[in-house]
């Protein structure tokens, strides 16, 4: 990492301020070539955490005013010498300032390269780096809080404490096995078992919160389904807060899938308003029905809508069959009209049924509560450690599996060496989670998801 990188760190759009970030051994010297300070002092003469007003020059011509902020290694985001040039936020202006920096010796940064350098320089671990991306892309307040908690080290501290328990047990076993003639007390089976179970319970707790954690950070694929004209599109509009789907009294109005991302309580839903499910001779409508069934298979959460003002028919019951063994909330719409639906049948078939009038906007609070309960986000504490990425889940499950093998080996009386192999494998999995022993390919994959400039 001897080279110096640069990129626009703010969105490329018109705005009040644009920031060009430069990081690397020669960052300050390169910035001195393009910034002439109002005071006449060079940036190289400034201490870290110092700002200087000046002008940016491209090919000896002033192109904008700026404020240059100097950070000296290791006290910077990347752990390297860093300069952030804040200029006016026009698209052309920021591109021209970046051009001046690149002409002066920096190279364009790759996607996520600033944060990757922060990771490689020990400024943050891999789980914290992933939290940076989650914080940037957060769409809900709970997701933002959870991402910041992870960035602030909540997950890292939890994993480190669990690793410490395992490493202590492993060291005691290794010492007793390697130095049998020394007066090292043998680690009792009960003590060893307690250590393994303590860590196992901690990992199980983390896994139990994974779905809820992922729901508030990444959002949930949600399908709105039902037969034609039960109010699916009206529900979509109610949750969206505006007319996203066309609503008419004509059955089969929605044929294609209409999508929208909305925040409902603590969770972000990626809604899909699907075509009404029924047998049809209309080719276009039939294609829409097939697409709806495919979306049901993909969905994590299903909102099944029924017309409360009409009796349940065979189409309704076929929809219930599609929902078997899935996370489903039954929504009885048109609660403003006299009820004719078999509510007892719905309640016996579905774990949760709520009543709304999408047309009148009634029942939204009850529906929000039902969604949060179904996803487990109603009880989640965003200040506590949680795993929110698939990579973290895989590492946690791998460590848990190794500990279960260790317990089995202990219970059947296998040697301490055999048990220790399982414990060491669990530690390896946890160290991969935090990135302390992650493979290069894993690290590259994590940072490939970042934007340039971060």
What are these regions (language model features)?
Residues 2-8, 12, 141-263, 280, ...:
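C-terminal-of-GTPase-core extension/linker across diverse P-loop GTPases
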Residues 1-145, 149, 153, 329:
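A glycine-rich (often HGG/GG-containing) alpha/beta subdomain
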Residues 15-17, 49-51, 298-302, 325-328, ...:
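Short glycine-/polar-rich loops that comprise or flank the Walker A/P-loop
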Residues 271, 305, 331:
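Generic enzyme active-site microenvironment
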Residues 240, 275-276, 300, 307, ...:
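Short glycine-/small-residue-rich Rossmann-like dinucleotide-binding loops
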Residues 52-64, 68-72, 252-280, 298-301:
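Switch I (G2) and immediately adjacent beta-strands of P-loop GTPase domains
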Residues 251, 277, 285-289:
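Short alpha-helix of the ABC ATPase nucleotide-binding domain corresponding to the H-loop/switch region
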Residues 285-309:
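Inter-motif core of Ras-like GTPase G domains
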């Amino acid at each position: 990492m001897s080279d110096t990188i640069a990129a626009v760190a703010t969105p490329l759009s018109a705005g009040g301020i644009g920031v060009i970030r430069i990081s690397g051994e020669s960052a300050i010297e390169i910035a001195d070539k393009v910034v002439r300070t109002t005071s006449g002092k060079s940036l190289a003469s400034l201490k870290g955490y110092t700002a200087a007003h000046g002008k940016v020059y491209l090919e000896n011509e002033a192109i904008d005013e700026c404020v240059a902020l100097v950070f000296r290694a290791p006290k910077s985001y990347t752990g390297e010498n860093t300069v952030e040039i804040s200029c006016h936020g026009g698209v052309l202006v920021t591109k021209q300032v970046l051009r001046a920096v690149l002409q002066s010796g920096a190279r364009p940064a790759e996607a996520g390269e600033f944060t990757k350098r922060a990771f490689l320089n020990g400024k943050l671990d891999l789980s914290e780096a992933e939290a940076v991306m989650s914080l940037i892309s957060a769409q809900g307040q709970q997701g933002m809080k959870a991402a910041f908690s992870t960035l602030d080290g909540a997950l890292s501290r939890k994993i480190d404490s669990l690793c410490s328990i395992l490493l202590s047990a492993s060291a005691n076993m290794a010492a007793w096995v390697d130095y049998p003639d020394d007066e090292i007390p043998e680690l009792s089976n009960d003590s060893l078992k307690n250590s393994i179970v303590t860590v196992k319970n901690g990992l199980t707790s983390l896994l139990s919160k994974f779905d809820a954690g992922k729901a508030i950070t990444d959002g949930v694929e949600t399908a709105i389904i039902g037969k034609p004209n039960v109010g699916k599109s009206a529900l979509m509009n109610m949750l969206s807060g505006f007319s996203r789907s066309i609503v008419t009294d004509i059955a089969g109005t929605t044929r294609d899938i209409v999508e929208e991302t909305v925040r409902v309580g603590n969770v972000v839903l990626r809604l899909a308003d699907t075509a009404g499910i029924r047998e049809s001779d209309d080719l276009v409508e039939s294609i829409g029905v097939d697409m709806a069934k495919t979306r049901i298979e993909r969905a994590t959460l299903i909102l099944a809508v029924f017309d409360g003002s009409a009796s349940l028919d065979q189409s309704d019951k076929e929809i219930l069959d599609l929902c078997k063994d899935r996370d489903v909330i039954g929504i009885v719409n048109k609660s403003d009209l006299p009820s004719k639906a078999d509510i007892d049948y719905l309640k016996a078939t579905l774990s949760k049924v709520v009543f709304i009038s999408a047309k009148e906007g009634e029942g939204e609070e009850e529906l929000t509560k039902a969604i949060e309960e179904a996803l487990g986000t109603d009880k989640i504490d965003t200040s506590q450690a949680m795993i929110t990425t698939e990579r973290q889940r895989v590492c946690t499950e791998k460590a848990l599996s190794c500990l279960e093998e260790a317990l089995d080996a202990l219970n059947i009386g296998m040697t301490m060496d055999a048990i220790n192999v399982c414990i060491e494998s669990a530690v390896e999995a946890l160290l991969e989670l935090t990135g302390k022993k992650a493979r290069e390919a894993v690290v590259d994959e994590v940072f490939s998801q970042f934007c340039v400039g971060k």
